[in-house]
């Protein structure tokens, strides 16, 4: 606790702070209140950004026992060397949306949740930094411990299909519509919009960046999406971690047999 207090005292302050407000408010009133609350809160030390480094991590596959837990948890992750202004980023974002980001309409959800009934919830995400070449592909699922092997096999199969066979033209066109609508809905939320505008202040961007990105999405071809997925999402490099009461699941299986 003393270390945390010292860190706060040595580094915290509003000298480099940014404030973004969205909604119905009085600008003069907010400006006066901001000065009243933060003008004297000076940062003890100058701000220095810590650069994030990409690391190609050797894949691991491990299971951890969590006794007496009814549900098991599956996590998969892959580090990707890419930034969000890379020409391939839009293709990867749309590819992930079709793979696991589009919830019930995604391939992972269709296969693992709806078709095979192996998971209560499954999905994936793809993110990339705006400053450094540090991106990541991430997937997760909640499931019954006895379904561990089947779920992992289905996950690997869908990753393999996405990176070798790719997506169809019909899938890509449908995904464009859904993905763009989700971004529009997100911007309609004041909290999301304020957060985006605040980060853009730091990045020296405007909403024009979003407009250009969404234009890229509209113009993507299946070939571009499939090429990007094959280039960046390497199945053999994905780390998989599972946690659950697998011992009890094995005992139940023995009893049934």
Where are these predicted regions, by residue range?
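In a subset of proteins, long, contiguous C-terminal domains/tails are tracked
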Residues: 221-257
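Conserved, carboxylate-rich catalytic/transport cores that coordinate ions
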Residues: 8
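An aromatic/glycine/proline-enriched structural segment found at the starts
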Residues: 18-83, 187, 242-257
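Short amphipathic C-terminal alpha-helix that caps PH/PH-like domains
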Residues: 34-35, 95, 154-159
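M16 family metallopeptidases and their MPP-like homologs
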Residues: 16-22, 71-83, 109-219, 235-244
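Active/ligand-binding-proximal structured segments within catalytic/core domains
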Residues: 76, 87-100, 108
